[in-house]
Structure formats: structure tokens, C-alpha cells
Curated annotation (Swiss-Prot):
Primary gene name: DTX15
Coiled coil spans: none
Biological processes per GO annotation: xenobiotic detoxification by transmembrane export across the plasma membrane
Places the protein is found: Membrane
Name of the molecule in the record: Protein DETOXIFICATION 15
Amino acid sequence: MREEREDMLSWPLIGEKEKRSRFVKEEVEKQLLLSGPLIAVSLLQFCLQIISVMFVGHLGSLPLSAASIATSFASVTGFTFLMGTASAMDTVCGQSYGAKMYGMLGIQMQRAMLVLTLLSVPLSIVWANTEHFLVFFGQDKSIAHLSGSYARFMIPSIFAYGLLQCLNRFLQAQNNVIPVVICSGVTTSLHVIICWVLVLKSGLGFRGAAVANAISYWLNVILLSCYVKFSPSCSLTWTGFSKEARRDIIPFMKLVIPSAFMVCSLEMWSFELLVLSSGLLPNPVLETSCPRTVWMIPFGLSGAASTRVSNELGSGNPKGAKLAVRVVLSFSIVESILVGTVLILIRKIWGFAYSSDPEVVSHVASMLPILALGHSLDSFQTVLSGVARGCGWQKIGAFVNLGSYYLVGVPFGLLLGFHFHVGGRGLWLGIICALIVQGVCLSLITFFTNWDEEVKKATSRAKSSSEVKEFAVDNGSILV
């Protein structure tokens, strides 16, 4: 040991270099262990909707169009909003876990569940009136009627989806994501059987796919809830139901509201708005058939970024947080190059996954290069958005996204798509312009960040949470 210290003193540069290399290697391993499962979870949960629509496709083109439009409408008005709301947990749970205030995670999850359940009530009313909204925005009445019916049968899904998002982020903050992968895998596998029974055998027709979504989401919630309740790995973070979850709702909402209007809502809303607008183009089926699955890869990286940054800030390690940002951005660049290259290489054959119609195949082939560019830009900004959530910059992120998408992206996309008759390409070019503006703004914010100050903010946030926890224990408000 003494000789090793003498060597370090004699060769300070070499020792420092080896130390940095070890830290980088450890950070890479941590993020791979996080991002890999998170990508799998995103893909598996996204596949629920895809599988449902695929089964509906066997019933004809009209039910397929209706289910696709209803799914997009549900995403705009429900799923994305709840996903954005739940992302507030990335900040509070991640930083509390990093600060070793484990008991606060359970209270924060319960508080988030309460808020998301209450928000689901008005959102379900919106879903019940889907047909009227679609007709108002100019959709074909026959498609709007079927879409409205599909959306009404999806209403039970929204309550389960909110709870599922809370459970996912509760475990993600603890770097415990393998159970989420397993439960999602089991649910998605069973979803195929459930869809087959309800869509093709029960007589429910295309409405059976919506019912299948609800069953599968609730099944996933039950599986994860059982894990949290009975697993020893959650014994410190889940200490039972607490009355304290009902306290400090207003301060929590100050983080929830900008979270809901950040990446998971403003960005997704703009994207889904353009998808719904594509239904007003001459061939809506073609415009809504473009692949979105690859977006789940940077979304998984974003989850890893928010978790690692929030954990390091909570533990009082500014250098660790900065290193986490550098590593995840490197992952993002590599991923965007690989996926973009693959999309371009398969552009002439990917269309056959949707149809044997030469028009469809040709259309998809012309769209994929644009999608490849969009994905590369989206990967970069999605990861930066994860960094923002880990730091608690939701308000800043909301304003950046508002300007990027609604002052630049959506107007430019609609202008190209409809006024200049560029079609679906114009809509996607609008999204690309928004991604460029968003990426530049978030990059500048991250580059000029004072990480020591961010640690102080995280410490203050975790300390206030700890005081709430101590109050809860002293007043006997922790319930079994």
C-alpha cells in the first residue's frame, strides 16, 4: 500500500488518468445497466398499442384507421400528459435516493399516484367525447364515430397507466429496473393472447383491442405492486401507506405542472398533433403508418440520464453528475448514428412490414431518410431533457419546448404540409426544425450549468423532504 502511494506521488499524471478512466468505466457500466432495461421496458409497453392496432388491422381498413386515430387522440389527451406528470418523480425520487433518504420514495410515489388518479378523471371525460372532438377538428364522421367508440372502451386504461408510470419511476430511481422489464415482458406476451380472444373470438370486434389494453395495463400494475410490497429490495423505500402523501400537494404540483408540459407533453403533443393533422391529408393511412418504435431507444437513455444525474446530485457529487451527462451524450451520439444508418439502409424494404401495396412501400421509402435525420436530432435532445429532469429544470424545459414546437415546429410543419402541399414530409420537416431549436437551447443550458449550485439545490430539496418524513413518523401517520 505504501509503495502504491509512493508511485502515485511519483507519477501524479498517470495516477490521475487511471483514476478518471476507472470513473468513466464505472459510469458507462451503470448507464448500460440502466438504459438497456429501460429501452426494453419502453419498447414492450409501446408494443401494447401496436399489437392492438395490428389485430384491428385484420378487421378492415376502416377499423384500422379508427383505432389508429383513437390511439393518437388518447396519447395526446391522456397518456402523454400522465407520463409528463409522473416525470416529476425523476427529480424528487432520484435525488432523495442519492441522498440516502430512502423512506421518502414511498411517500413521493403515493403522492404522485394520488395526483395522477385525480387528473385521470377529467381526462377520461375528454376520452368519452372523442367523437365530438374529432368531428370538430375535421375528421371524417365515419372514422370519428368508430374512434369515439374505441376511446370510450379505453377509459379504464388511463387510470392504470398513471399508476404504472409511478411504479416504474419509483423503481427506476433506485436503479432497480429488471423487475419492470420482467413484468412488462409478461404483460406484453399475455396481451397477444388477450387481443386474439377479445378482437377475433369474443364478438367485440375492434373494441376488444381497447378492452385488451385496459386489462394488460392493470395486470402490469398488479404485478409491479406485488413486487414492491413483498420484495426485500424495496423494504427501505416502501414502508407502507402514509397519510403524509396527502400533505404538500401544492408544492409538489409546482414541479408536476411544468413536468407535464415539458418533453413528455409539449413535444409529444406537437408530434401527435401533426399525426392527427395528417388525417386531413389525401391519404391519412399512409401518413399515420410511419414507424415510431425507434424513438423508444433515446427515451430509455433519457431515463438513465435523469436517474444518474439526480442520484449524483442528491449524493452531493457535482463531478459525478457532470460525468454522467458526458457519458449519456456519448451514448446518444453513437445510438443516433447507428439507428439512422439502419433506417436508411432498410428504407426500400421496411414498407413491406405495413403493406404489399407498392404505393405504401414507395411512400415509406421516401419518408425514412427524413425520419433518420429526425431521430438523430431527437436522440440528442431527449437525453438532454432527461438531464433537465434529473436537475429539476422542468420550468426551463417547458419554456424551451413551448417555443421550439409551437412557435417553430408545428407552424412550419403545417405550412409545408398543407399550404405548400409537401404532405407528410412537410409535417416531419416541421418537427426537425423544432428539434434543432430545442437541442441548441438545452445544450447551451447544460454547458453553462454550475453543478456545485445544482448540488446545493438538490440538498435543499431532499432536506425539506426529510423533514416531512420525520414529521410523519413522529405523528404516527405511517400505515401498514
